[in-house]
Amino acid sequence: MSLLSRMRKINDMLQKSGVQHVNFREMAETLRDVISANIFVVSRRGKLLGFAIKQEIENERMKKMLEDRQFPEEYTTGLFKVEETSANLDINSEFTAFPVENKELFKTGLTTIVPISGGGQRLGTLILARLNDSFNDDDLILAEYGATVVGMEILHEKTQEIEEEARSKAVVQMAISSLSYSELEAVEHIFEELDGKEGLLVASKIADRVGITRSVIVNALRKLESAGVIESRSLGMKGTYIKVLNDKFLVELEKIKAS
């Protein structure tokens, strides 16, 4: 397959990421197929975002690492010393992707490290590993292009996370601002009683203890539920089951109580 054909396959991956969520496993599989190497996409903190294996490595430590989807902290920290593509590192390199405890088995193994950057920051690392053939210039062009595409997807995910967090916070603030003073007081007591994200409460008991009417509690819960902040379910004589759906709710409630 020509360099152009292989670049087009990576480009297809880029086009797809613009219109739908592309998972990192699919990205790793595409890079594995066009570069013919084991591919590991590693986050800043060493989390294995995605990987694809061309040549199986029979080693228990490596298998566990892939199962846990986490690279060792020391190795991950070391990767940040690599600021530009480092190609064809042998088994004696501190960055080898092959198990050093089996040096004799993997003595021909070569590793290439490609930093993943975007938005002026280091986002992670693309690691490529081969047992025999060295990585040539075409492979490195594809690897660096692939790292750029992966970086764009990481940035896209980060942006989505920030937007989702802002939306969640706005929904909670609107829900809380819709409560009357007595309803807000009732809500504070309800979640003191729950002492967590979900649980069972008896509205009449709280009403009697705090000195508010049961209808105030019911109205407060109804408003929070219609905003999608909580879900509640009546269990008859046992009380009402409540579950917090929006993680920002309890945080905002604590801020109000502390102010």
Swiss-Prot record:
UniProt cross-references to InterPro entries, sorted A to Z: CodY, GAF-like_dom_sf, GTP_trans_reg_CodY_C, Transc_reg_CodY_N, WH-like_DNA-bd_sf, WH_DNA-bd_sf
Record Pfam families: CodY, HTH_CodY
Keywords assigned by UniProt, alphabetized: Cytoplasm, DNA-binding, Phosphoprotein, Repressor, Transcription, Transcription regulation
One example GO MF annotation: DNA binding
Protein location: Cytoplasm
Chain positions covered by the region annotation GAF domain: 1-155
Gene3D superfamilies associated with the record: 3.30.450.40, Winged helix-like DNA-binding domain superfamily/Winged helix DNA-binding domain
GO BP term (any one): negative regulation of DNA-templated transcription
Residue numbers bearing the Phosphoserine modification: S215
Primary localization class, coarse: cytoplasm
DNA-binding segment(s): 203-222
A GO cellular-component term linked to this record: cytoplasm
Entry-linked HAMAP family: HTH_type_CodY (MF_00621)
Family, as annotated: Belongs to the CodY family.
Function: DNA-binding global transcriptional regulator which is involved in the adaptive response to starvation and acts by directly or indirectly controlling the expression of numerous genes in response to nutrient availability. During rapid exponential growth, CodY is highly active and represses genes whose products allow adaptation to nutrient depletion.
Name used for this protein in its record: Global transcriptional regulator CodY
Recorded name of the encoding gene: codY
